[in-house]
Amino acid sequence: MRKFLRMTRKSMWLTGAALLAVAATSSIALAAVNVKSEPTASFSGASVTLTGGEFSGLGNIEAQAELTVTGSATYTCTNPQGHASPGQNPVPAQPGSSGPVGLGNSEHNGRGTISNLKASVAAPPTPSAKQVGCGGTGSTKWTVTLDTLTAEAAHLEVTQRNKLVFCRNYALGGAATGTAC
């Protein structure tokens, strides 16, 4: 009889522990990040700046936001006689990133904010005259000079414990609040 009682207590303890584990994981799964205000993007030349993103429900584990941008570069070509001609083909710019930035939620009861997140594209290695669409059939005598760098698209990811909790895509000329990923 004692053996039976010990076995019963042990199985009840294991069952209770299993139920507790299920309850804990399901409550974590049901917890969701609430977006109080969506971050808005402002495009200016080679840069994109995000402001105004407010989140709650993040808990006390620091959430990270990272903004990446892509864009293009335009060039002017100058021939050996000194005459400038705009290139006809934009060239992809080097992508840029804000790097991961904490939202401050671990210090503010689970509320996090994107106050001023900025990333910029950079000039790629100088292309050839042929790549930018001037200089005929690959003449190496043309001088290629950077004209403009333009950020054209941005991608925001908010992660917590390496899990994506919020994502937006932004486009030059598109809605300031972007679109869901």
Model regions and ranges:
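Well-ordered, non-transmembrane segments within structured domains
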Residues: R2-F4, L30-A31
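Bacterial N-terminal signal peptides that target proteins for export
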Residues: K3-T15
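Bacterial N-terminal signal peptides
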Residues: T15-S26
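Mature extracytoplasmic or otherwise solvent-exposed domains
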Residues: A31-C181
